[in-house]
Regions:
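Left-handed beta-helix
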Residues: 1-155
């Protein structure tokens, strides 16, 4: 097994390095038993996916979901969730990184975003859909189109 190094000095390179972890056979394989991963354990319950109704299904595809997360009738695709993130019903999150303690209200649409810690996203919020609107709300939008919501932001 050879070593791994990646420049993550910009928003776009940080986002891409994280998205690369979701590939079927990533260059940095977090599941390689020959190269153990040492990390802090939060001692939280496992992630939970709930609701299975017609248009209200808690699900995630091609994503990494940490302990303590609840996907309650919302859906994720190509996302990385830190501990204690909640995705509420009818919300869709794609190509995004959500840090610890983020709550996504109902009917939200989030695309290609990095949401920092302790952010409560109200119902019907759209992030990463319209860069001009995101900038008006004080969010950074990178050259590559990644929207960053700062830690503790009030939306």
């Amino acid at each position: 097994e050879r070593g791994y190094w990646r420049d993550v000095g910009s928003i776009d390179s940080y986002w891409q390095a994280n998205m690369d972890l979701l590939d079927y056979n990533p260059e940095l394989n977090l599941y390689c038993m020959d190269w153990p991963l040492r990390t802090y354990n939060y001692n939280l319950p496992p992630a939970k996916f709930i609701w299975e109704e017609n248009d209200r299904v808690g699900m995630a595809t091609n994503s990494m979901v940490s302990e303590g997360c609840i996907i309650s009738g919302g859906s994720l695709s190509r996302c990385i969730l830190s501990p204690q993130v909640r995705i509420n019903s009818f919300s869709n999150v794609t190509d995004s990184i959500l840090m610890e303690n983020v709550n996504v209200g109902r009917y939200c649409e989030i695309r290609k975003a990095i949401i920092d810690k302790n952010v409560d996203i109200p119902p019907y919020t759209k992030i990463g859909i319209n860069p001009d609107e995101d900038r008006k709300r004080g969010f950074l939008v990178s050259a590559g189109g990644v929207t960053v919501v700062p830690k503790g932001a009030i939306l």
